[in-house]
Design a protein with these regions (language model features):
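Short glycine-dipeptide loop
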Residues: 152-158
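Short catalytic micro-motifs in class I SAM-dependent methyltransferases
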Residues: 132-139, 184
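Short, glycine-/aromatic-enriched active-site segment of Class I SAM-dependent methyltransferases
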Residues: 159-187, 192-198, 219-226
């Protein structure tokens, strides 16, 4: 494994530059479709807001690859794939059967399961692979990234979004950090740990930042309530309302494979 591990959220700051593993290396049975919102109950109700944000993500990706074959790992209900479809030949992999079935009803090519050798072989080589808020959920992120790299065409790109364990927000909040949510999140990454994994696989980091995102107000409320130890609500009338948010604790990383 390219990254090293800490043993507790209170580890020293030097350790925060490395990947941190929660000792629960299994996929929770209660994981929400796509795993994108830590059990957030109204993912489908937030479709208008999410698709607006995903449209921005597509525009960003096209700076690095304007067209070609695109795979979204952990595609949930396919909202990102819908936005990418005008520019790419899209496919997805989704662990939740209900969400994957929904995608297929929208004429999206989505396989149910993990991004394993079997599913990736069925889909074939890709020019773009996205793991949007997914890597932290996986039992073996290094192995998944290695498989994705194998099925990435020369010169292709991988887009990763995940929490930044070295961020100021993570340091200040500690165990109450909004993204410190075991068992949904099994791994916590820093830029250094992602760079180590990527370099070992022959990938180079082409871009890194902490972008602003348009987030459903209901998700903001959900995370605040959870951080305060309050009972989280289900669906909300504010799911369709978006709010620009940036706590500078979520990374966006573009990796490129050598041509």
């Amino acid at each position: 494994m390219a990254a090293t591990f800490c043993s507790a959220p209170s580890a020293a700051s030097a350790e925060r530059r490395r990947a941190f593993l929660i000792p629960a290396p299994t996929i929770p049975a209660t994981i929400s479709p796509g795993g994108h919102a830590d059990g957030y109950a109204d993912y489908r109700g937030a479709e208008p807001v999410l698709r607006r944000e995903f449209a921005n993500t597509v525009d960003f990706i096209r700076k690095y690859r304007a067209s070609g074959r695109l795979l979204d790992v952990g595609c949930a209900y396919g909202f990102f794939l819908q936005e990418a479809r005008p520019y790419f030949d899209v496919a997805g992999i989704e662990i939740a059967e209900e969400a994957a079935t929904f995608c297929r009803k929208q004429s999206l090519r989505v396989l149910t399961g993990m991004a394993d050798e079997y599913n990736l072989a069925q889909l074939g080589m890709m020019d773009v692979i996205t793991l949007l808020d997914v890597l932290e959920h996986l039992p073996s992120p290094h192995e998944t990234l290695a498989l994705c790299t194998r099925y990435l065409s020369p010169g292709g790109v991988i887009l990763i979004t995940t929490g930044d364990f070295a961020s100021h927000s993570a340091r200040v909040a500690g165990a109450r950090w909004r993204l410190m949510t075991p068992p949904q999140h099994l791994w916590y990454f820093t830029l250094e740990s992602v760079e180590r994994m990527s370099h070992a696989l022959g990938l180079r980091v082409e871009w890194y930042d902490h972008p602003w995102k348009i987030v459903p107000i209901s998700l903001v409320a959900f995370q605040i309530r959870r951080m305060l130890g309050m009972r989280t609500a289900g669906t909300s009338t504010t799911s369709g309302v978006g709010l620009p948010v940036n706590l500078f604790d979520a990374m966006r990383i573009v990796l490129r494979k050598s041509a």
